[in-house]
């Protein structure tokens, strides 16, 4: 787990049975429920760029422990933000659980298999290059993404 940015949540809160609402700076665009994924979606290609790089995007994750609002670093990681937003809009995260919860430290989610292994590369079916150069510190409350090594987002 060399690089972190989105999907794996490093947040001091923990939750289960959640929903994600992807929001740009004007209006909500989608709501996703997180639990056990029943749709088993796999994609053949990385999504086309569909976000507006001039807008600010965020996600609202609703859990039975409360809500978490996540702001994305669109300028720093446009491919990663586009990936998360596109997958959320398509329902990819519907019923996906937080498979790892460490109280007071972090939660991890986004793996449809519910194991954290991603069925060893099956999900979502494509990879893309790393974007961050670690300019942003990983402080308390930062959301991040794990991968299997360089350029395996």
Each model region followed by its residue ranges:
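Sec-dependent N-terminal signal peptides
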Residues: 4-12
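Cyclophilin-like peptidyl-prolyl cis-trans isomerases
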Residues: 14-153
């Amino acid at each position: 787990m060399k690089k972190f940015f989105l999907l794996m949540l490093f947040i001091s809160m923990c939750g289960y049975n959640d929903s994600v609402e992807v929001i740009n700076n004007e209006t909500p665009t989608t709501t996703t429920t997180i639990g056990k994924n029943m749709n088993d979606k796999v994609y053949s290609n990385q999504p086309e760029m569909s976000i507006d790089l001039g807008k600010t995007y965020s996600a609202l994750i609703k859990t039975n422990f409360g809500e978490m609002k996540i702001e994305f670093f669109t300028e720093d990681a446009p491919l990663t933000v586009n990936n998360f937003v596109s997958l959320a809009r398509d329902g990819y995260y519907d019923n996906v659980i937080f498979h790892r919860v460490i109280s007071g430290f972090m939660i991890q989610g986004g793996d449809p298999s519910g194991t954290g292994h991603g069925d060893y590369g099956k999900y979502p079916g494509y990879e893309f290059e790393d974007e961050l150069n670690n300019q942003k510190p990983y402080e308390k409350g930062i959301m991040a993404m794990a991968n299997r090594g360089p350029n395996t987002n």
